[in-house]
């Protein structure tokens, strides 16, 4: 029986692991991909993490992974299938969690720190995408494929604008197509000052299809159906929470984010939530790290009382 099982090896999960190790808890950290460091690895540039002037998301996440490895913490690669809370009614423990994995194995733990984060939304959720259309989620990973070519990014948030700036140094032209700009004003200013980036705002993407070797984007702008053609396409329309593995009793928002307070406590005793999966106003690397630390501390306090 473990003290806690940490599900997720992004910044929130790894932060929880650091604090769990320092508290001498008996725990495991589980990740679907042991070599991944979560959504942060797709960030082209992180400039708002205290103490670090500028770093790629992958390098930031990897430095944290190196830190936990130096502490002797090993990420175990497994995919969660289900989590069940079980009433024990023994002298030693009154309740515990059974975590079942797709490989048929199970873990039993007094608590769970759920930090599985979110995954990219697909463009098929907002428009018609033909089967032969290929697009990307990561500019830093796939941007070099389009050196000197024309690319487009669908999305209006910080990710879209940051990746546009990165792609502007590789591609010939970059077009941002969005129904609403929600990126920070500093990013918007940088994009507007970059000559080979254009922004098509208040546009509704209707369909994506191929003609010869090009990707065609049909969109509605001011009630007029327009068309643009590019060599490469990137998606930055947000993410959806991976909350479908948690116990059915756990309260969630309408969008599927788990309801938890600043200590990570949910409506289920012993079940804690950290990182992007938690309903909150700000989802950043720094808030994910804080969530993980708070959850590990909450586990320590919970175990003292149980």
Regions from the language model: what does each represent?
Residues 38-106, 181-201:
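N-terminal Rossmann-like dinucleotide/flavin-binding domain of flavoprotein oxidoreductases
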Residues 3-28, 163-164:
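N-terminal Rossmann-like FAD-binding beta1-loop-alpha1 element of flavoenzymes
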Residues 5, 22-41, 176-184:
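Glycine-rich FAD pyrophosphate-binding loop
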């Amino acid at each position: 029986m473990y003290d806690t099982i940490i599900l997720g090896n992004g910044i929130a999960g790894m932060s929880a692991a650091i604090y769990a190790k320092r508290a001498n808890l008996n725990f495991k950290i589980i990740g679907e991909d042991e070599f991944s460091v979560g959504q942060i690895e797709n960030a082209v540039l992180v400039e708002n993490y205290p103490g670090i002037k500028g770093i790629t998301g992958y390098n930031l996440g990897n430095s944290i992974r190196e830190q936990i490895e130096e502490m002797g913490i090993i990420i175990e690669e497994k995919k969660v299938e289900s989590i069940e809370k079980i009433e024990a009614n023994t002298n030693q423990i009154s309740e515990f969690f059974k975590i079942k994995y797709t490989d048929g194995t199970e873990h039993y733990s007094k608590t769970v720190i759920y930090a599985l984060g979110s995954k990219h939304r697909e463009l098929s959720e907002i428009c018609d995408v033909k089967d032969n259309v290929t697009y990307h989620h990561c500019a830093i990973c796939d941007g070099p494929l389009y050196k000197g070519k024309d690319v487009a990014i669908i999305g209006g948030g910080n990710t879209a604008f940051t990746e546009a700036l990165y792609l502007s140094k590789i591609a010939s032209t970059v077009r941002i197509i969005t129904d609403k700009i929600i990126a920070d004003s500093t990013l918007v200013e940088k994009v507007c000052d970059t000559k080979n980036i254009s922004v098509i705002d208040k546009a509704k993407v209707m369909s994506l299809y191929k003609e010869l070797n090009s990707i065609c984007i049909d969109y509605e702008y001011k009630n007029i159906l327009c068309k643009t053609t590019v060599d490469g396409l990137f998606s930055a329309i947000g993410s959806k929470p991976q909350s479908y593995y948690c116990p059915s009793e756990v309260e969630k928002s309408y969008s599927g984010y788990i309801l938890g307070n600043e200590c990570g406590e949910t409506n289920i005793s012993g079940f804690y939530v950290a990182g992007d999966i938690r309903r909150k106003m700000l989802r950043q690397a720094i808030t994910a790290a804080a969530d993980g630390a708070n959850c590990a501390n909450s586990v320590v306090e919970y175990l003292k009382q149980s």
